[in-house]
Amino acid sequence: MKAFKQKQVWFITGSQDLYGPKVLEQVAKNSEQIVHGFNESSAISIEVVYKPTVKSPREIHAVCQAANSDENCVGVILWMHTFSPAKMWIAGLNELSKPFMHLHTQFNAELPWSEINMNYMNTHQSAHGCREFGFIGTRMRKERKVVVGHWQSSDVQAQIDDWCRAAAGWHESQNLRIARFGDNMRQVAVTEGDKVAAQIQFGYEVHAYSLGELNEAIADIAEGDVTAQLDRYASEYQVGNELFGDEYQLDRLRKEAKIELGLTQFLTQGGFGAFTNCFENLTGMTGLPGLATQRLMANGFGYGGEGDWKTAAMVRIMKVMGQGRAGGTSFMEDYTYNFGATDQVLGAHMLEVCPSIAAAKPRLEVHRHTIGVRCDVPRLLFTGKAGPAINVSTIDLGNRFRIILNELDTVTPPQDLPNLPVASALWEPRPNLAVAAAAWIHAGGAHHSAYSQAITTDQIVDFAEMAGAELVIIDADTKIREFKNELRQNSVYYGLARGL
């Protein structure tokens, strides 16, 4: 079963009528076998759909238009089995609005040395057919992914899956609606941004709603539904006897369950995939949602604290991209440092860290929250599982958006955190904290990020290219002088590409 049940990527093979019916029959047969192989492979998470070989400008234009209008198609894979004169592709590529990958492969892995003849050469000539197609892509300034190698190779299939996941994320971005309850945290700069520019570039919509509208949805929740929700909590988390046995804590938990159900109903009925709130805008609320927000993220919603709609969008997009993969994705904040033999960052937030990143079964507890509405708030406590991860931040620079990515290694804390009443993750940034933090600050990265152990750097690279957005990467090879030069060069490039 593919992780993406209703999404598809179309496989389109280019050729021409020059070669005659026998060669074209072989081209079609080989293409169908490749598609079958992709669909049988557990390495590729999206259904690949075979499309008949295109041999003329009219056929190419028609299939590109069909891909554009198909709601389930998130992108197309293009392969030139034979030579397909690239002028035939101009109208179709001009029309194509879905992302496309250029797969540079051939059906047979090895040459049949003792049998090869000109018929074989004319049939299996992607080595130069794909170069012709590559030229027109470059000439038309088309952003695309190029994957090279035999189609049965595990590395090739991994690259295809990365791109397919990015295409699914891009499709989600084009259709995403984000609900904002309240505004940004007062006086904070980085969470601000141009929502119109974001919708033009990324596709997602951001809409604001009053706390009154949300409170009405919460008030409509039946007490029987609240009781059923508490039963779910008891079965899914570690819950001490004192929580359900204490009348006050139980009341706080019932209020939190009602918030969760009301939020879920509001977001679902409105077609929203992500939301934000702010501890400074909680009029009429019984508290800042803690457990409620954590569970909504665990169920796939994006979230951004203090009105951070850009991070909320990226959390949702990355959750979609990571479907079916081990690891999780969460809203996160760089909170405090551990300077020592290896410098580390303790990431957390007031309450809202997604349990999809937990190393063990989370504990459900009620603790005092002292920012905004001061009250006792139920929340899940855990530490993030060890392993490679990334932090991704999207910022608005005025004339463009920049995505910043830092590769990390999440580690197990050397000691317990008995007095920390929030979920957290401890990580070591690559190449080290000194370089990573300096580069992040030079790039203007936010204190919020989308943290993930399910998503790879390559997937974010593919997504950023689909969006036409600037991406800077902080990894094991980063050096500050080179990184600062990259930022300067990017400023010139994007200024010329889009206008100052």
UniProtKB/Swiss-Prot annotation:
Keywords: Arabinose catabolism, Carbohydrate metabolism, Isomerase, Manganese, Metal-binding. CDD domains: L-arabinose_isomerase (cd03557). Mn(2+) binds at E306, E333, H349, H448. GO terms for biological process: L-arabinose catabolic process to xylulose 5-phosphate. GO terms for cellular component: cytosol. Its cofactor is Mn(2+). InterPro entries: Ara_Isoase_C (IPR024664), AraA_central (IPR055390), AraA_N (IPR055389), AraA_N_sf (IPR038583), Fuc/Ara_isomerase_C (IPR004216), Fucose_isomerase_N/cen_sf (IPR009015), Lara_isomerase (IPR003762). Binds 1 Mn(2+) ion per subunit. The keyword Transferase does not apply. One of its GO terms (molecular function) is manganese ion binding. Pathway: Carbohydrate degradation; L-arabinose degradation via L-ribulose; D-xylulose 5-phosphate from L-arabinose (bacterial route): step 1/3. Its EC number is 5.3.1.4. It comes from the Bacteria. It catalyses: beta-L-arabinopyranose = L-ribulose. Gene3D superfamilies: 3.40.50.10940. It is an enzyme of class 5 (isomerase). HAMAP family: Arabinose_Isome. Catalyzes the conversion of L-arabinose to L-ribulose. PANTHER family: L-ARABINOSE ISOMERASE. Belongs to the arabinose isomerase family. This is L-arabinose isomerase.
